[in-house]
Amino acid sequence: MRDPHLAGIDPRHILDASSKHRLAAVIRETLPVADAEPNEQFDKVTRFLGNMLSLRPDPSSMIGNAAEMVSRLAGGLATWARRLDFAPFRLRVVGTAGSGKTQLALAEFSAAIDAGLCPLYVCYNRPLADHIARLMPAGGRVVSFHMLSDAFAREQGGAPNYGASDVWEQIEAQMTASPLPESWKYDVVIVDEGQDFSIAWRDIVLRMLKEDGRAIWLEDPNQNLYGKDSVPLPGWVTLHSDTNYRSPRQIVDILAAIGATQTPVEAGSPFKGADIEELIYPEGDTEAMLAQTRRAITLCLGAGFTRDDIAIASFRGREKSVILHLDQLSDVHTLKSFTGEYDLFGNPQYRDGGLLAESVYRFKGQSAPAIIFTEIDFAEMDQLVLRKLFVGMTRARLKLVLVLSDRAERQLLDRL
């Protein structure tokens, strides 16, 4: 270096090829090597000379890689389930969360469209139906059972009276007894969330299947949040898919340890560990719960996740939840949550916020890179609690923050 002063640092600390033999001596002169406790500068130089790098994961890169790997692994169900050959084609898939049920539904629906056929996809949850509709190709019908019922009732002569206490019983009776127009018969019928269907719903949907059509019934007993009995499907071929490819293995292991899996679940995710954090609040302290939820958002943002990567899932239903009735948690944390109202076309109305917030009931069937599972509180860990924990925790693809009461934490620790 011709003029070391131009470098902006002490010229005595600049070494080049001609003075490389002085490297060790300069370091010893500059750093307190003899000190019992070397300072921060000494540690930095040691890490530099030892080629030690301070790295942190890039969530944006991990999200893309995780989605690609999980899709590839879980795609096996969609591939070989559709290679099965029997007639009539009536396939019941009992599959755990993250086993590829959605990919199978997408593959079957898309193949029907490509073949010029008319498919029907029916699930329980409206949010899941809206989510799947964005993934499916144009054509056919993608609905929740209640959307299907509403459309049928309107086509038969008028809008249902949703003010009546027995409105759904009336609609079910109408769908069971009314003649079925040809326009309501489908070549392919796919039922998702079958564990939430009743026998009456089964009969209503399956009467829409053409005689030589294909039918696939997808269900997960571990996600039975409504306590329904398993619907009998006599004569159907049953296929079990017990590997969860989506949830990090640590989450699957925790759920197995606390007894949240009624049927065995195998961890098949490419990610062994999960970024799991617990934030505790005193039982019954709503303000503390909200404060810990805000802290959970900060933790997710600090880990590099964007607001679009984060979903808030409440352990409570929408009516009993505190968070799901708020427009915001703070000035910077606004919420996008269902208001409980619908427009004239039957579309659900959402608050115009930046962070998605749903109940564990409505978010079933979907997932996000980072999940904040909040308002977790229970006096006794019964089967419903275990199923809600299973559903909520398996929504997370990379990071999971549990916001739970102190009494809920004690019961979890007792089981682990």
Question: Across the structure, where does each feature detected by a protein language model lie?
Answer:
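Accessory nucleic-acid engagement/destabilization modules that flank
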Residues: M1-G50
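Non-catalytic propeptide/linker segments at domain boundaries
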Residues: R56-M62
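Short glycine-rich substrate-engagement loop in P-loop NTPases that contacts/grips substrate
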Residues: Q156-T176
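Phosphate-binding/switch loop-helix module in NTP-utilizing enzymes
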Residues: A177-S183
